[in-house]
A protein has these predicted regions:
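Extracytosolic ligand-binding ectodomains
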Residues: 1-182
Length: 182
């Protein structure tokens, strides 16, 4: 669902944006080299850079022809808020232990931006007009006025939902098995 939210967000900004998906965990595969060899210069990389590796190649960044990297935006996670939400649900008795006993399923702790667990930092190097538009988009997401899974959505196989259909539910988002059409 993260890949699709990213793809839909990119498409909202630029309807002609194309997402090229390269898996970073494949053995003997240099995903960055593959993207750059295709002429792709704007990359959504790891959310964080390892402490032992000084790098600017995280979040959404751009690689210039000379190899210089400039950051555009990066997600930030408030792990304190994450654990606070989980502990509060345990203390209030709303925690569902049955999720822990299904060893064949990955656990999904999906919290949107409105929860305070995740936010985004925009680069100070962004053009003021882009910063203005992205700030308005962020505020729309936080207020619930804008949601990537509202409105018409197309997968690579065709229409997922038309513009009048309700927003995808949390369960539909977490369990999606399709890729956006861009």
């Amino acid at each position: 669902s993260n890949v699709n939210a990213f793809a839909i967000g990119a498409q909202m900004i630029n309807p002609y944006a194309r997402i090229h998906l390269e898996w970073s965990a494949l053995r003997d595969h240099d995903w960055k080299k593959s993207l750059l060899s295709q002429g792709i210069r704007t990359i959504s990389g790891p959310e964080l850079t390892p402490a032992k590796k000084l790098s600017r190649e995280f979040g959404v960044y751009r690689v210039a022809e000379d190899g210089a990297v400039s950051n555009i935006a990066t997600p930030i996670f408030d792990w304190g808020r994450f654990y606070e939400i989980i502990l509060r649900s345990i203390l209030e008795g709303s925690w569902d232990n049955s999720r822990l006993t299904k060893s064949h399923e990955a656990l999904n702790f999906w919290f949107g931006m409105e929860s305070g667990v995740i936010d985004v930092i925009l680069s100070g190097q962004l053009h003021y007009a882009s910063r203005k538009m992205l700030t308005a988009l962020r505020e729309g997401v936080l207020s619930g006025r804008i949601h990537p899974f509202d409105g018409e959505i197309h997968s690579q196989e065709g229409l997922i939902k038309d513009a009048q259909a309700p927003r995808l539910s949390s369960e539909e988002i977490v369990n999606m098995h399709w890729l956006n059409d861009n």
